[in-house]
Amino acid sequence: MNLLIMGLPGAGKGTQAAKIVEEFGVAHISTGDMFRAAMANQTEMGRLAKSYIDKGELVPDEVTNGIVKERLAEDDIAEKGFLLDGYPRTIEQAHALDATLEELGLRLDGVINIKVDPSCLVERLSGRIINRKTGETFHKVFNPPVDYKEEDYYQREDDKPETVKRRLDVNMAQEEPILEHYRKLDLVTDIEGNQEITDVFADVEKALLELK
């Protein structure tokens, strides 16, 4: 089974990806792991990516696409199938993935899209607070400190609601054309992500069993 998982930051995509890998035994291909492995193994694309990263530059699409292609061409993929997590990030990368899969004789079986209302995501992502003395991390709603005094805690700039909302807006603008592309191919299953983790996975599992 060859899959792609999508969802905005805070939707619980990483948690569900780990559960899919455990339950279905597919190879988990996350962008970060893929880059680290390619650079550690000094593949052609890995060396190229490292040259950009060492200069503090963004890795261009053609290198990212090349690293994905190298990984998808490995033996375990034909045997186990894959779950792509964190790629494609743009519609151009989605088209490149289509071409790569065709070239390697693989096909995408499904796209799992974990949907959570953006306002819920802002609450999830902007609730993080840090104790000034201990550095411990808490969440205002989901994991509040026992003796909360506002002056004892601070919030990172990245976690402030307005920053989180801007980040989500950027992600939504990138994800929409990708989802539209895969909807036209009838590959997308939307999963309600604003429920308990076990309930989300029950819906994911049901969708994937129907694909098999």
From Swiss-Prot:
Under which pathway is this protein filed?
A: Purine metabolism; AMP biosynthesis via salvage pathway; AMP from ADP: step 1/1
Cystine pairings recorded for this chain: none
Q: What is its EC number?
A: 2.7.4.3
Q: Does the keyword Cell membrane apply?
A: no
Spell out the subcellular localization from the entry: Cytoplasm
Q: Which CDD domains match?
A: ADK
Spell out the residue ranges making up region: LID. Answer: 127-159
Region NMP: what ranges?
30-59
Major enzyme class: transferase
User: What are the record keywords, sorted?
Assistant: ATP-binding, Cytoplasm, Kinase, Nucleotide biosynthesis, Nucleotide-binding, Transferase
Q: Name one GO cellular component term.
A: cytoplasm
Cited InterPro entries: Adenyl_kin_sub (IPR006259), Adenylat/UMP-CMP_kin (IPR000850), Adenylat_kinase_CS (IPR033690), P-loop_NTPase (IPR027417)
Q: Which residues bind ATP?
A: 10-15, 128, 137-138, 195
Task: Give the domain of life.
Answer: Bacteria
**What GO MF annotations does this protein's record show?**
adenylate kinase activity; ATP binding
One Gene Ontology BP term is:
AMP salvage
PROSITE patterns cross-referenced by the UniProt entry: ADENYLATE_KINASE
**What does the record give as the reaction this protein catalyses?**
AMP + ATP = 2 ADP
Q: How does this polypeptide assemble, per the annotation? A: Monomer.
Protein family (similarity comment): Belongs to the adenylate kinase family.
Share the domain note from the entry. Consists of three domains, a large central CORE domain and two small peripheral domains, NMPbind and LID, which undergo movements during catalysis. The LID domain closes over the site of phosphoryl transfer upon ATP binding. Assembling and dissambling the active center during each catalytic cycle provides an effective means to prevent ATP hydrolysis.
Function in brief: Catalyzes the reversible transfer of the terminal phosphate group between ATP and AMP. Plays an important role in cellular energy homeostasis and in adenine nucleotide metabolism.
Q: What is this protein called?
A: Adenylate kinase
Source organism of this protein record:
Streptococcus pyogenes serotype M6 (strain ATCC BAA-946 / MGAS10394)
